[in-house]
């Protein structure tokens, strides 16, 4: 990206040298945030009839969280690039088991693990050591929500957790948003699995995604403030 702005960048094993460069490209588009797309892709994973368009996102991305493409494909999504962005389609071929190391993509853990729990997918996950250090202790949040879905989530090692398969989904769950924007948005998307979700302390989405609730309504989700 810096080279596209005309900078001269020299990389060595221990040093990055940036020199004054030439003229940047006439126009540079900024790619949307892949981590925000994780909530919509979790909804697509949970709903077998889903097809969503992620505007201005492409499979060829420099963002680490674009690992969502690999995750999505393993969890039954098919991706198609079009001019407007990226279409994700649920193929109805969800696996019975899924494993992933979230060390490089910690913000994806919440929505993906919850989607697996809602879909009845068993899993083994690693790279979760940083989750208690986020806006809330997200491991506690995951454990509570997973249990409310009728599944289990137990620690098996340092940063390693195992997800057991749920039984029957409940008709409705209540989630404490913990003042954590990602807990709130991940929990809200569980409604794509066909259950009612009451989210307490939901205002925190304004930190990273102020238009989240309006976009949910525009996408056909129904909700009301209690």
What residue spans do the PLM features occupy?
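Short, structured segments at the rim of ligand-binding sites
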Residues: 1-226
């Amino acid at each position: 990206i810096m080279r596209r702005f005309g900078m001269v960048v020299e990389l060595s094993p221990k040093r990055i040298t940036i020199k004054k460069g030439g003229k940047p490209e006439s126009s540079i588009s900024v790619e949307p945030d892949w981590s925000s797309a994780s909530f919509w892709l979790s909804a697509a994973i949970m709903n077998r009839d889903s097809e969503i368009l992620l505007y201005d996102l492409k499979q060829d991305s420099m963002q680490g969280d674009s690992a969502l493409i690999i995750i999505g494909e393993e969890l039954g999504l098919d991706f198609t690039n079009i001019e407007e962005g990226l279409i994700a389609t649920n193929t109805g071929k969800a696996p019975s088991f899924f494993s992933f190391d979230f060390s490089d993509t910690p913000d994806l853990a919440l929505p993906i693990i919850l989607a697996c729990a809602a879909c009845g997918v068993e899993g083994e996950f690693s790279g979760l050591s940083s989750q208690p250090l986020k806006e809330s202790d997200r491991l506690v949040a995951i454990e509570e929500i997973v249990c409310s879905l009728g599944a289990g989530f137990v620690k098996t090692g340092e940063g390693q957790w195992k997800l057991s398969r749920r039984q029957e989904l409940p008709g409705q769950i209540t989630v404490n948003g913990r003042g954590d924007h990602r807990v709130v948005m991940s929990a809200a998307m569980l409604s794509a699995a066909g259950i009612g979700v009451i989210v307490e302390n939901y205002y925190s989405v304004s930190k990273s995604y102020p238009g989240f609730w309006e976009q949910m309504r525009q996408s056909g989700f129904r909700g009301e403030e209690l």
